[in-house]
Swiss-Prot record:
Biological role stated in the UniProt entry: Conjugation of reduced glutathione to a wide number of exogenous and endogenous hydrophobic electrophiles.
MF term (GO), any: glutathione transferase activity
Catalytic activity: RX + glutathione = an S-substituted glutathione + a halide anion + H(+)
Protein name in the entry: Probable glutathione S-transferase 9
Entry binding sites for glutathione: Y8, W39, K43, G49, Q50, V51, Q63, S64
Organism: Caenorhabditis elegans
Keyword Lipoprotein: no
Record has Transferase as a keyword: yes
Length: 206
């Protein structure tokens, strides 16, 4: 039997979607949440000096999206065909682009960097948010299934649903102009195994 361990900080962050893939699949795994002090001790023992790190029977795999894509293929939620997999990956890359574009706003908002939060919100976040959520809305309409690609859940459904939930936590009206995406978040987080995970996971700010 394969043994899985996911090593990440005591937060959702870049480790959460991998955790939700495990949860959806009903796959047991060790959810090792480390402190900053523990991170300093193990950093040099990780592949790229960063987390998350996935251990599969002791072998290490790094990079959050690579981990999620690997697990999704193992558990059948990467897309039902090579074409669907490519569509899912394209949305994943678009999501990454959005996060890069909006990063200065999020960092300033969380106090990690200086900057006028209100101005960054208007200049960076809003355009990036509107662009991405428009793209994802069109994907939902195109699939006609309630999922982003094809007729079943993929890892990108988990990723965008969690991001939508995080945004709604900060601003309950933010998806009022993207109601399809609001419904999508509710749908994904109502899936029994996902819902169960969200209810039992440690409470963290992000």
């Amino acid at each position: 039997m394969v043994s899985y361990k996911l090593i990440y900080f005591q937060s959702r962050g870049n480790g959460e979607i991998a955790r939700q893939v495990f949860a959806f699949a009903g796959q047991e795994f060790i959810d090792e949440r480390i402190s900053k002090e523990q991170w300093a001790e193990i950093k040099n023992m990780t592949p790229f000096g960063q987390v998350p790190v996935l251990e599969v029977d002791g072998r290490q795999l790094a990079q959050s999206i690579t981990i999620v894509r690997y697990l999704s293929k193992q558990f059948g939620i990467s897309g039902k065909s090579s074409w669907e997999e490519a569509q899912v990956d394209a949305l994943g890359d678009q999501f990454k682009d959005y996060r890069v574009e909006a990063r200065p706003f999020f960092r300033a908002k969380m106090g990690f960097s200086d900057g006028d939060v209100d101005q960054l919100y208007k200049d960076l976040f809003v355009p990036a948010f509107n662009k991405m959520y428009s793209i994802f809305t069109e994907s939902l309409k195109s699939s006609g299934s309630g999922f982003l690609v094809g007729d079943s859940l993929t890892w990108m459904d988990l990723a965008i649903a969690q991001h939508s939930a995080d945004l709604l936590e900060a601003d309950g009206k933010i998806l009022d102009t993207f109601l399809e995406m609001k419904d999508h978040q509710k749908k994904i987080h109502s899936i029994p195994n996902v819902k169960k995970w969200i209810e039992k996971r440690p409470v963290t700010s992000r």
